[in-house]
Amino acid sequence: MSELKIRDPRDIILAPVVSEKSYGLLDQNTYTFVVKPTANKTEIKIAIEQIFGVKVTSVNTMNRKGKVRRTRTGVGKRPDTKRAIVTVAEGDRIDIFTGPVA
């Protein structure tokens, strides 16, 4: 049998996505994270459960292409990113956006 290579969960989950759309999904127990592009759904689920101590019910991922930007010296490209939309079980919450509201 093949062995699942366990990586450090903090290397898989890079940052939460802070946007209006991600704030709107908080009421549905759905959170959005920027993840390592090589991570799969199983690794993302295990990492979220280990870091935040919640039960994950589903993981959806999307690959986003980096935009091409022109500069004075030529053309550059922003890096490609991968996002994970994670739904946690009813009653579980992840407090990543807590703090004073401006």
UniProtKB/Swiss-Prot annotation:
Database matches in Pfam families: Ribosomal_L23
Keywords: Ribonucleoprotein, Ribosomal protein, RNA-binding, rRNA-binding
GO biological process: translation
Keyword Kinase applies: no
GO molecular function: rRNA binding; structural constituent of ribosome
Disulphide connectivity of cysteines: none
Domain of life per record: Bacteria
Listed Gene3D superfamilies: 3.30.70.330
GO cellular component, one term: ribosome
Role summary: One of the early assembly proteins it binds 23S rRNA. One of the proteins that surrounds the polypeptide exit tunnel on the outside of the ribosome. Forms the main docking site for trigger factor binding to the ribosome.
Summary of subunit composition and partner proteins: Part of the 50S ribosomal subunit. Contacts protein L29, and trigger factor when it is bound to the ribosome.
Family: Belongs to the universal ribosomal protein uL23 family.
Protein name: Large ribosomal subunit protein uL23
Classification lineage: Bacteria, Bacillati, Actinomycetota, Actinomycetes, Propionibacteriales
